[in-house]
Amino acid sequence: MDNLIIAGILLLIKAMIFCIVNILEVLLEDIGILKSLFLHNAITIISSSVLYFLLSYYIINPRISASIIFDDCFSIFMLSSYTVCDDILITRILNKQMMLQFHPIRTIIKLLQHFPVKSSPNAHTA
């Protein structure tokens, strides 16, 4: 169990680093992104980053769920072309055997490739 906790902490740190890098990339690529966001809905220029972080946390924690159901994700801001996820439901508890067989980083990256963060179509280019 101690090995799982150590591995989990390392994966969580990687996820946090990935979050920060992804947020900075989005902001640097499209400075105009801040003007395009609306505060009245599920605002996410960082939805993929946060999703990566959450999935990593739930997958590496053997006492918490890691089965994710996306309910109409990434479809709210179609006009501004931002990807959004408004509902994540955790449904299954992992046991030790599943934990040892699961590869969270690879799986999450595959998930994020299906739902990339897109920049605004009227973005300013440097």
Swiss-Prot record:
Any one GO CC term of the record: membrane
Membrane topology value: Multi-pass membrane protein
Lineage: superkingdom: Eukaryota
Transmembrane segments: 4-24, 42-62, 64-84
Localisation: Membrane
Keywords, alphabetical: Membrane, Transmembrane, Transmembrane helix
Name listed for the protein in its UniProt record: Putative uncharacterized protein YLR334C
